[in-house]
Amino acid sequence: MIQISALPAFTDNYIWLLQDHATQRCAVVDPGDAAPVQAWLDAHPGWVLGDILITHHHHDHVGGVETLKKATGATVYGPASENIPGRDVALKDNDTVRVLGWDFDVYAVPGHTLGHIAYYHHGLLFCGDTLFAAGCGRLFEGTPQQMHQSLSRLAALPEDTLVYCTHEYTLSNLKFAAAVEPDNRDIAARLEKVTRQRENGVMTLPSTLALEKLTNPFLRTGEILVTQKVDERNGPQNRAPSEVFAALRAWKDTF
């Protein structure tokens, strides 16, 4: 059985640590800083870091890769179309990678960056900075249409899928969601819960796709109350869901 834990890094990053207790081998996702991973390995003698999975090239996701690879000899997986330090295996859409005995499907999810990928295994999604709890990543390289398509692809996964994104942005994202849908009871309830969690220093991840579909405005671009709110701000138009997404993302950027 694989255990998944979070190693906090920087101010709001999580490095996901996958642990196979039967073999004492582990893997990490997006180690932007080597120190938390090294500290865990030092505290768990006998464990071997065998694999490093990377979703995209931003420094807060790859900054610790080369140090960890040098120290452990771990195999580094990452998107083929981005410059990933120390990468051994270049991945593209629909590839499969075997980690700790689990097969992960690779999804190309451009938007935050053009080469961004996500890893999925039977109810587990490691999605980097594409889908957040109650939000989504900023568009540094891709277009709104690309990001909307990427989110739609992830939203089509089973609803009980656990969403392991890389940042603790849930509270601020829910405040925006409440502005978009002030009468959404699911958003209000989640905001109340997350507020208490953060006051007590409790992490809010992982999420589930079912919860995201109820409370994440970027997965609700076809909902009439969401389109009405966008029309209130931008004027009434016959908008496609991707255009609603673009308007929401632009609003969130200045929220």
Swiss-Prot record:
Molecular function (Gene Ontology), one example: hydroxyacylglutathione hydrolase activity
Protein's pathway: Secondary metabolite metabolism; methylglyoxal degradation; (R)-lactate from methylglyoxal: step 2/2
Coiled coil start-end: none
InterPro entries: Clx_II_MBL, Glyoxalase_II_hydrolase, HAGH_C, Hydroxyacylglutathione_Hdrlase, Metallo-B-lactamas, RibonucZ/Hydroxyglut_hydro
Enzyme Commission numbers on file: 3.1.2.6
Amino-acid positions noted as binding Zn(2+) 2 in the UniProt annotation, renumbered to this chain: 60-61, 129, 167
Reactions that this protein is recorded to catalyse: an S-(2-hydroxyacyl)glutathione + H2O = a 2-hydroxy carboxylate + glutathione + H(+)
Similarity remark: Belongs to the metallo-beta-lactamase superfamily. Glyoxalase II family.
Gene Ontology biological process terms in this record: methylglyoxal catabolic process to D-lactate via S-lactoyl-glutathione
The protein's assembly and partners: Monomer.
Cofactor: how and how many bound: Binds 2 Zn(2+) ions per subunit.
Keywords: Hydrolase, Metal-binding, Zinc
UniProt KW Metal-binding keyword: yes
Name of the molecule in the record: Hydroxyacylglutathione hydrolase
Job description of the protein: Thiolesterase that catalyzes the hydrolysis of S-D-lactoyl-glutathione to form glutathione and D-lactic acid.
